[in-house]
């Protein structure tokens, strides 16, 4: 462990956690042992002195784009997906607080009875007080992914880097689960991600990150302690930058 925060390159980070990461090997919902492991990884990073914000997806409960494909109005489907992210955020908050991690959930869709509305200044203040802020509700707008929300919130919070936790250990030129010969990139430019149509994030999210010079690091959440390792430039990952 690094006890001196000044020795760390990244002092304020945003972690993007997909809904799928929260369900483990299940087909739907939550796997609490997996969530507890993720919470433990987050605590390890907090103990380094790093300020942490989180954006959660909702794909383990509902995927708006899939519902739209079978005939549901896309905007309505996306709003339902945003509600799914709030469920995930509250679940993650509960598990994190069981580990004595001070946590606040801020939703882009106001739900005063269950969490705070997203206000940028309030979110920044929570982070300054070393609370973990979990952003829910996506951007609050339909037709926008939670990846776009992650990029926007990282920029708004002045984060040093966005870390995307996935099921694989980086960005590949094709799906490594389907193609055993898939080539892994250790670093790749925003332009090449867009040009090669790599499905690590949607094009809009990558474009906004590029415009604001926000580096993105993609790593596997499956291995215990990976979050802390990646923060310290260790382990397996891919960095997306200019």
Curated annotation (Swiss-Prot):
Q: Which reaction does it catalyse?
A: UMP + ATP = UDP + ADP
Q: What is this protein called?
A: Uridylate kinase
Q: Where does ATP bind?
A: 16-19, 59, 63, 166-167, 172, 175
The EC designation for this entry is 2.7.4.22
Out of the domains of life, which is the source? Bacteria
Q: Where in the cell is it found?
A: Cytoplasm
Top-level enzyme category: transferase
What GO cellular component entries does it have? cytosol
Q: How is its activity regulated?
A: Inhibited by UTP.
> Which gene is the coding source of this polypeptide chain?
pyrH
Family, per entry:
Belongs to the UMP kinase family.
Single Gene Ontology MF annotation: UMP kinase activity
């Amino acid at each position: 462990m690094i006890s001196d925060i000044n020795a760390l390159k990244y002092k304020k980070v945003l972690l993007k956690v997909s809904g799928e990461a929260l369900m483990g090997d299940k087909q739907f919902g939550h796997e609490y042992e997996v969530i507890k492991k993720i919470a433990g990884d987050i605590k390890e990073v907090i103990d380094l002195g790093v300020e942490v914000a989180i954006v959660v997806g909702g794909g383990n409960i509902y995927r708006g784009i899939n519902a739209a494909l079978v005939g549901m109005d896309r905007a309505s489907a996306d709003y339902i997906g945003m509600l799914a992210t709030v469920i995930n955020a509250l679940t993650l908050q509960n598990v994190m607080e069981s580990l004595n991690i001070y946590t606040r959930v801020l939703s882009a869709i106001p739900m005063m009875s269950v969490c705070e509305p997203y206000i940028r200044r309030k979110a920044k203040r929570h982070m300054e007080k070393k609370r973990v802020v979990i952003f829910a509700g996506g951007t609050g707008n339909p037709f926008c992914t939670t990846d776009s929300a992650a990029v926007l919130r990282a920029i708004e919070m002045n984060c040093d880097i966005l870390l995307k936790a996935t099921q694989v250990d980086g960005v590949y030129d094709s799906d490594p689960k389907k193609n055993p010969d898939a080539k892994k990139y250790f670093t790749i430019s925003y332009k090449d991600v867009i040009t090669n149509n790599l499905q690590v994030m949607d094009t809009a999210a990558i474009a906004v990150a590029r415009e604001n010079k926000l580096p993105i690091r993609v790593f596997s959440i499956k291995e215990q302690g990976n979050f802390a390792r990646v923060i310290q430039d260790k382990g397996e990952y891919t960095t997306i930058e200019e």
